[in-house]
Amino acid sequence: SVTYCPLTGTAMGFERGDTTFGVSGRLVNNNLIMYDRGTEAWWPQVLATSIPGPWNEDPGTESLSEFRLVWTTWGKWTDKHPDTRVLSFDTGFAKSYTRDPYGTYNPRDGYYDADASPMFPALNEDDRLEPKRVVIGTRTAEGAAAFDMSALRSAKLLEGDLAGSPVVAAYDPELDTGYVFRNPEDRRFDYRDGAVVDGTGGTYAPSALPTERLYAFDAMWFAWSGFY
Protein backbone atom coordinates (compact mmCIF):
# COMPACT_ATOMS: atom_id res chain seq x y z
CA SER A 1 0.00 0.00 0.00
CA VAL A 2 1.18 3.52 -0.84
CA THR A 3 0.05 5.97 1.84
CA TYR A 4 0.25 9.73 2.22
CA CYS A 5 -0.61 12.12 5.05
CA PRO A 6 -0.55 15.80 4.01
CA LEU A 7 -0.82 17.01 7.61
CA THR A 8 2.57 15.50 8.53
CA GLY A 9 4.17 15.46 5.06
CA THR A 10 4.74 11.71 5.14
CA ALA A 11 4.59 9.36 2.15
CA MET A 12 5.19 5.75 3.19
CA GLY A 13 4.90 2.31 1.61
CA PHE A 14 3.79 -0.85 3.41
CA GLU A 15 3.67 -4.53 2.48
CA ARG A 16 0.03 -5.39 3.10
CA GLY A 17 0.00 -9.15 2.47
CA ASP A 18 -3.51 -10.46 1.86
CA THR A 19 -5.32 -7.62 3.60
CA THR A 20 -6.14 -4.09 2.45
CA PHE A 21 -6.00 -0.83 4.35
CA GLY A 22 -8.55 1.90 4.85
CA VAL A 23 -8.44 5.35 6.45
CA SER A 24 -10.05 5.46 9.90
CA GLY A 25 -10.72 9.20 9.82
CA ARG A 26 -8.79 9.57 13.08
CA LEU A 27 -5.42 11.21 13.73
CA VAL A 28 -2.63 10.97 16.28
CA ASN A 29 -0.09 13.80 16.35
CA ASN A 30 -1.83 15.05 13.16
CA ASN A 31 -0.85 11.79 11.45
CA LEU A 32 -3.35 9.52 9.74
CA ILE A 33 -4.46 6.31 11.38
CA MET A 34 -5.04 3.47 8.94
CA TYR A 35 -6.91 0.27 9.68
CA ASP A 36 -6.54 -3.10 8.06
CA ARG A 37 -9.66 -4.88 6.93
CA GLY A 38 -8.37 -8.26 8.07
CA THR A 39 -8.03 -7.67 11.83
CA GLU A 40 -9.53 -4.14 12.01
CA ALA A 41 -6.48 -3.08 14.01
CA TRP A 42 -5.47 0.58 13.77
CA TRP A 43 -2.08 1.58 12.39
CA PRO A 44 -0.68 5.12 12.85
CA GLN A 45 1.19 5.69 9.61
CA VAL A 46 4.46 7.08 11.01
CA LEU A 47 4.70 4.46 13.75
CA ALA A 48 3.75 1.54 11.45
CA THR A 49 2.78 -0.26 14.66
CA SER A 50 -0.66 -1.58 15.57
CA ILE A 51 -2.83 -0.12 18.31
CA PRO A 52 -6.23 -1.33 19.50
CA GLY A 53 -9.10 -0.03 17.41
CA PRO A 54 -12.74 0.47 18.42
CA TRP A 55 -13.87 -2.58 16.43
CA ASN A 56 -11.52 -5.21 17.83
CA GLU A 57 -9.83 -6.42 20.95
CA ASP A 58 -6.20 -5.56 21.60
CA PRO A 59 -4.31 -7.39 18.81
CA GLY A 60 -0.97 -7.08 20.56
CA THR A 61 1.89 -5.05 19.18
CA GLU A 62 2.65 -5.78 15.55
CA SER A 63 4.69 -3.85 13.00
CA LEU A 64 4.30 -3.48 9.27
CA SER A 65 7.02 -4.25 6.74
CA GLU A 66 7.90 -1.03 4.95
CA PHE A 67 9.38 -0.11 1.60
CA ARG A 68 10.99 3.17 0.64
CA LEU A 69 9.10 5.81 -1.30
CA VAL A 70 10.96 8.76 -2.82
CA TRP A 71 9.42 12.20 -2.47
CA THR A 72 10.58 14.16 -5.50
CA THR A 73 9.26 16.03 -8.52
CA TRP A 74 7.85 14.25 -11.53
CA GLY A 75 10.48 15.95 -13.69
CA LYS A 76 13.41 14.68 -11.61
CA TRP A 77 11.92 11.20 -11.40
CA THR A 78 11.34 10.82 -15.16
CA ASP A 79 14.79 12.23 -15.94
CA LYS A 80 16.27 9.31 -14.00
CA HIS A 81 13.54 6.77 -14.79
CA PRO A 82 12.15 7.70 -18.23
CA ASP A 83 10.31 4.38 -18.67
CA THR A 84 8.14 4.92 -15.58
CA ARG A 85 4.46 4.13 -16.10
CA VAL A 86 1.64 5.92 -14.33
CA LEU A 87 -0.75 3.18 -13.28
CA SER A 88 -3.93 5.21 -13.65
CA PHE A 89 -5.31 8.73 -13.67
CA ASP A 90 -8.73 7.30 -12.90
CA THR A 91 -9.00 7.50 -9.11
CA GLY A 92 -12.66 6.56 -8.96
CA PHE A 93 -13.46 9.87 -7.29
CA ALA A 94 -14.75 13.15 -8.69
CA LYS A 95 -12.21 15.13 -6.66
CA SER A 96 -9.29 16.45 -8.72
CA TYR A 97 -5.87 15.29 -7.57
CA THR A 98 -4.05 17.72 -9.87
CA ARG A 99 -4.19 20.43 -7.18
CA ASP A 100 -3.18 20.25 -3.53
CA PRO A 101 -5.82 21.95 -1.35
CA TYR A 102 -3.28 22.56 1.43
CA GLY A 103 -0.79 24.66 -0.55
CA THR A 104 2.33 24.02 -2.62
CA TYR A 105 5.62 22.29 -1.90
CA ASN A 106 7.67 24.07 -4.57
CA PRO A 107 7.78 26.81 -3.41
CA ARG A 108 6.51 25.87 0.03
CA ASP A 109 3.50 27.94 1.04
CA GLY A 110 0.13 27.61 2.69
CA TYR A 111 -0.05 24.76 5.16
CA TYR A 112 3.41 23.53 4.08
CA ASP A 113 5.27 26.71 5.04
CA ALA A 114 8.03 25.75 7.49
CA ASP A 115 6.90 28.31 10.09
CA ALA A 116 3.20 27.46 9.88
CA SER A 117 1.50 25.76 12.80
CA PRO A 118 0.19 22.19 12.64
CA MET A 119 -3.53 21.87 12.04
CA PHE A 120 -3.99 20.34 15.51
CA PRO A 121 -1.78 20.55 18.64
CA ALA A 122 1.35 18.40 18.38
CA LEU A 123 2.33 15.76 20.92
CA ASN A 124 5.59 17.59 21.59
CA GLU A 125 7.06 21.03 20.90
CA ASP A 126 10.72 21.08 19.91
CA ASP A 127 12.06 24.45 18.77
CA ARG A 128 15.37 23.19 17.38
CA LEU A 129 13.74 23.48 13.94
CA GLU A 130 10.65 25.20 12.57
CA PRO A 131 7.55 23.03 13.07
CA LYS A 132 7.18 22.07 9.42
CA ARG A 133 10.82 21.97 8.40
CA VAL A 134 11.29 18.77 6.40
CA VAL A 135 13.59 16.16 7.91
CA ILE A 136 14.54 12.73 6.69
CA GLY A 137 14.26 10.34 9.57
CA THR A 138 15.12 6.74 10.33
CA ARG A 139 14.12 4.57 13.27
CA THR A 140 15.15 1.11 14.38
CA ALA A 141 14.55 -1.01 17.46
CA GLU A 142 17.50 0.81 19.06
CA GLY A 143 16.35 4.39 18.51
CA ALA A 144 15.71 7.14 15.98
CA ALA A 145 17.61 9.88 14.16
CA ALA A 146 16.60 12.69 11.79
CA PHE A 147 18.47 15.04 9.46
CA ASP A 148 17.35 18.48 8.29
CA MET A 149 16.82 18.14 4.53
CA SER A 150 17.84 21.76 3.88
CA ALA A 151 21.12 21.18 5.70
CA LEU A 152 21.66 17.91 3.84
CA ARG A 153 21.14 19.63 0.48
CA SER A 154 23.82 22.13 1.40
CA ALA A 155 26.36 19.82 3.04
CA LYS A 156 25.69 16.73 0.83
CA LEU A 157 26.84 14.48 3.70
CA LEU A 158 25.85 14.68 7.36
CA GLU A 159 26.98 12.54 10.27
CA GLY A 160 24.69 11.58 13.11
CA ASP A 161 24.11 9.28 16.03
CA LEU A 162 21.47 6.59 16.42
CA ALA A 163 21.34 5.23 19.97
CA GLY A 164 25.10 5.62 20.32
CA SER A 165 25.98 4.20 16.90
CA PRO A 166 27.29 6.38 14.04
CA VAL A 167 25.09 6.96 11.00
CA VAL A 168 25.64 9.03 7.88
CA ALA A 169 23.15 10.69 5.53
CA ALA A 170 23.94 11.23 1.84
CA TYR A 171 22.19 13.62 -0.56
CA ASP A 172 21.07 12.55 -4.03
CA PRO A 173 20.76 15.67 -6.24
CA GLU A 174 19.22 13.74 -9.13
CA LEU A 175 16.10 13.00 -7.07
CA ASP A 176 16.49 15.70 -4.42
CA THR A 177 16.30 13.12 -1.66
CA GLY A 178 18.49 11.60 1.00
CA TYR A 179 19.54 8.18 2.25
CA VAL A 180 20.68 7.13 5.71
CA PHE A 181 23.27 4.45 6.42
CA ARG A 182 24.79 2.78 9.43
CA ASN A 183 28.46 3.67 9.81
CA PRO A 184 29.66 1.31 12.57
CA GLU A 185 33.35 1.81 11.80
CA ASP A 186 32.87 5.60 11.71
CA ARG A 187 34.38 5.69 8.22
CA ARG A 188 35.19 9.01 6.60
CA PHE A 189 33.26 9.86 3.42
CA ASP A 190 33.57 12.84 1.08
CA TYR A 191 31.24 14.13 -1.61
CA ARG A 192 32.63 14.85 -5.08
CA ASP A 193 30.77 15.58 -8.30
CA GLY A 194 27.53 13.96 -7.20
CA ALA A 195 29.19 10.82 -5.81
CA VAL A 196 30.38 9.69 -2.39
CA VAL A 197 34.06 8.78 -1.99
CA ASP A 198 35.52 6.79 0.91
CA GLY A 199 39.03 6.82 2.35
CA THR A 200 40.28 4.15 -0.07
CA GLY A 201 39.15 6.08 -3.13
CA GLY A 202 36.06 3.95 -3.70
CA THR A 203 33.23 5.84 -5.37
CA TYR A 204 29.57 5.21 -4.64
CA ALA A 205 26.18 6.55 -5.60
CA PRO A 206 24.50 8.42 -2.71
CA SER A 207 21.96 5.59 -2.52
CA ALA A 208 24.55 2.81 -2.37
CA LEU A 209 27.23 3.42 0.25
CA PRO A 210 29.15 0.26 1.25
CA THR A 211 27.29 -0.23 4.51
CA GLU A 212 23.75 -1.02 5.63
CA ARG A 213 21.13 1.37 4.31
CA LEU A 214 18.33 2.11 6.75
CA TYR A 215 14.71 2.68 5.91
CA ALA A 216 14.06 6.44 5.96
CA PHE A 217 11.30 8.84 5.03
CA ASP A 218 10.53 12.56 4.87
CA ALA A 219 8.42 14.11 7.62
CA MET A 220 7.65 17.51 9.09
CA TRP A 221 9.75 18.20 12.16
CA PHE A 222 6.82 18.59 14.56
CA ALA A 223 5.54 15.16 13.52
CA TRP A 224 8.91 13.46 13.83
CA SER A 225 9.79 15.03 17.18
CA GLY A 226 6.31 14.24 18.49
CA PHE A 227 6.76 10.54 17.87
CA TYR A 228 10.52 10.29 18.42
Residue ranges and their predicted role:
Residues 1-228:
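Mid-to-C-terminal functional-domain signal that highlights helix-capping/loop sites
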